[in-house]
Structure formats: C-alpha cells, structure tokens
Amino acid sequence: MKNDKVTPRGAYPHTKRVGDFIFVSGTSSRRAENTFAGVERVDEMGTKRLDIKAQTRAVRENIAKNLAKEGATLNDVVDVTSFLVNMNDFAGYNEAYAEYFNAETGPARTTVAVHQLPHPDLVVEIKVMAYKKQ
C-alpha cells in the first residue's frame, strides 16, 4: 500500500480541533515522498522554475486532505492566511486561489510577504481555520 501521508517537519500537528473550530497549520506543496509540487528543474546546472500556481493548487489539495481527517472540507474554511515569498507572484497565486474560493462566498483572507519559507523551493505556504460542528 502506498503511503501518501505527509508528516509534519516540526513539533506541531497538521490540525488542531478546538470545539467546532479546526486550525490547519501552515501547509506547503510538499508531497509524501518529500518533493514539492511546482518545482521544475530546467537545466543540468540545477536551475529551477518555481510555479506559484502549481504550488498553490497543491497546497489547497494538502489542506483538503488535512481537513478530511477532521471530517471537514474546504467549504468549511472561514479564514485563510497566505504567506508569499515574492509579491510578484500575487497574480498567479490569486488566479489559482480563485479556482476554488471566490470573493462572494469564500473565506476571509490575509496575504502577506515573508522573507523565506522552510525550504528554498517553496514560494507559498497557507494556514486556514475552518468551522465544522462536531
């Protein structure tokens, strides 16, 4: 059986439930085999292309998996905090984000720029809060 579970890389849980609220820790595009979605090696020198849209989609999928462990879905998300390494990626991030969430019915959202994330191949990390009655 394939193990597709991503394990935390620090002393924290992926999710924390407090009553009807579910907090999902900062999530990246990391896959179970410890590679990252949205990272393409483009030459023999090791140059990489980091794709904000692909990473944002993968983060959303990872968040959905973590919410499912708590019996919730992306529809239960009420607040999103996104961390971008480069605000020049905002348009691509926003485009991928809007493939699922929209301004009328989506969650509240804050997007901030950060100096770096825990791995140099990461361009986005997202944490969410969801509300799902137990």
Briefly describe each language-model feature range.
Residues 1-61, 65-78, 84-134:
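N-terminal presequence-like segments and the immediate start of the first folded domain
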